[in-house]
Amino acid sequence: MTAATDIDRAAPKRLSVRPTIDPSATVRDCRLGAWTEVGARTLLIETAMDDYSYVVNDSDIIYADIGKFVNIASHVRVNPGQHPMDRASQHHFQYRSAAYGMGADDAGFFDWRRSFPVTIGPDVWIGHGAIVKGGVSIATGAVIGSGAMVTKDVAPYTIVVGVPAAPLRARFDRPIQDAMMRIAWWDWSHDRIKERMADFRALSAEAFCQKYDPKA
């Protein structure tokens, strides 16, 4: 048996301004920003993902607009397909008809699905196994707990958990939330963020706001 200390550590991951997409991922009709990453066996369809955002392995994201610095854990579902519960049948033979030799697919049904996009603001964290239903907006700085099912909009800097997801608490009190929105650090340049890395690491949110809030 080999001691753990004798095993070479993998080289540090290095991203770039070009999106990093795992070979096993499927990305179709998407726009990906700089320093973005798509993990193994993840599916992205008709989705925009802005700079620095990433999604880990085994996630499905469809019809979504994802802001900067969004953190999406594994096994997350964003905008899972809805079935026509109001029809005589819920089965997809009605809209994937070609697969069953029953004529052309129902393009209108897929347009209906597209009419409920998901919007995710900057600096959001979506935990392992969470589900975000169509038409939902998740605002800046929010946290979606692992295994949560989000069926309603989530306010800025709010932590939600459970099925259906409900607010647990705020990440910060309102003055800090407002200051963070004024600072909008997620819109800083790459060089500015790099220059201020020590403050991101060492300062509390309150101290960070005191230093960088233009109204402070």
Place the predicted regions along the sequence by residue.
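Leloir-type glycosyltransferase catalytic cores
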Residues: D111, F116, A184, S189-A198
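A generic "structured core" feature
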Residues: V143-G145, M149
